[in-house]
Amino acid sequence: MMTPKSAVLGLCLGLSAFAAAGSAYAGPAVSTRWRESEMSQDECFHYAEIAIQAAGFSRIERTTQSCYGTRGDYTAAIRCIIDHKVIFFIVAGPSLEQAPKYLHDIYDHF
């Protein structure tokens, strides 16, 4: 027979396991900004590479619309959607405090 004391102990253990599992499965911190732009795709990529490198990111790569870089556990991306006159700035990594700081640095260098 379960006593109230063992029921409370079981509930506490279950809640602890649930909290630990939630932390283990937490996703990365993602910080974003955007701005309108009239620049060309080539200009956007040029400034994107400069901004990402100036913020201390390396291993710069390009896709058809985006420029990426890495800095430790963080990834930065600048997506140039020139057809819609929009540029997206994205930084993802493990810290909710650091990701926005890196994003601000990249945005300011663009």
PLM feature segments, named:
Residues 50, 56-75:
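A cross-family detector of function-defining hotspots
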Residues 10-19:
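Bacterial N-terminal signal peptides
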Residues 15, 33-34, 88:
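Generic anion/oxyanion-binding catalytic loop in active/binding sites
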Residues 1-11:
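Bacterial N-terminal signal peptides that target proteins for export
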